[in-house]
Amino acid sequence: MLAATMIVSVLAGCGGNQNEGNTNEKENVTNSNEDTQSVSAETNENGDETLTVWCWDPTFNIYAMEQAEKIYQKDHPDFKLDIQENIYNDIETKLITAATSGDYSTLPDIFLMQDYSFHKNIANFPGIFTELTDSGIDFSQFTEGKLADSTAEGKNYGLPFDNGATIMAIRSDMVEAAGLTVDDFKDTTWSQFEELAKKVVEANGVPMIASSGGSELLMEMLQSAGASPIVDGKVHIADNEALKKTMEVYKKLVDEGIIAEYTDWDQYIASMNDGKTAGVINGCWIMSSIQAAEDQSGKWAIVNMPKLDGVDGATNYANCGGASWAVSSNCKNTELAFDFLKSTFGSSVELYDDLLPNAGAIASYIPAAQSDVYNQASDFYGGQAVYKDIVGYAGSVPAFDCGAYYSDIISALTDAITNVVQNNADIDGEMNNAQETLEFNIEN
């Protein structure tokens, strides 16, 4: 359900181009920063060490902020957070309302933003952000692919939080029934995976991989190849060779019964829990859904995803989903906000050690993988130290540019792959249609 909520929020939060309003927005950045400096000085004089935060999910994001507050209070006993729960759609609405009205006084000091919403909001509403590039946070300690989501023109606007690294979770018992091992599926190409998967399908009578339909898996495959649908701010669909290979592979695997598509999310999850599939490729957050089937403990394993054959720079790594912390232009004490974020989510292994077992939050902070907590074996995954492996995967994810048009790209590619899979439509023709659709939507 977390994943479903994420997808709905992302699609609701991304939208069309609003360049006409950017000039006023840039003016608002300057004015807002001037106001922030004066308010910050007043706040420091009064000795107030309270920051307001907007985020959602009491057991995940809010819990994380509460633990970060406790850690920071060890050296700053007067520090407090005023954490205000808002679902993401409401946060996005409030941010856009503030930006369009030019009144930023309603914004909190810190807010959580879905990663795929950053580029759109930075482009259309830059006045809501305080830039973090010179905040003192060491961004080199976070994965390149994750950072790209909240970075624009070389400037940082978000501090990465949870990890959406792509995994391939497979049923080890079904793999063994085919005379194979889990290790056989590590570091494969898609052609190698295809041959292995055929054996698993034949031995167990179920598809190798469940897909939630649409273009989610396509986007992960494309990113793993180091390719993007946007290049230098322009749509790059029609002549995108990596995307064409991705669609060809996906279509072939569906036709061969290796991938089974589910358009209903509950049925998609049930396919894993009920033994109707031998695996799944998705962001690592899918693990919580897999683990709902307690009777399958010890029967699952995690490996990296296959990579595209014949593509220079192709990898076995991608990312799907996640969120990052941002500081608003209305922050009343930017120095305090910067130091709090730097000292907690930006550097505290202690914090991430708490969040993993108690909230299920896997870090995007690379050094967290070296801690004892991340090295602990998981009984559910047959004794594998899955969290260490996942953070390692995240460190190898290529950067991926969807610009400000993520939802438009998802929609266009979903239409394209649906026509290819269900109607045997020509791939080149569908890519051209997607290109034209995106260019029209962006220009209008």
Where are these regions (language model features)?
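Conserved C-terminal helix/tail region of periplasmic/extracytoplasmic solute-binding proteins
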Residues: 176, 182, 255, 364, ...
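Hinge/lid segment of periplasmic solute-binding proteins
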Residues: 37-43, 112-167, 192-196, 202, ...
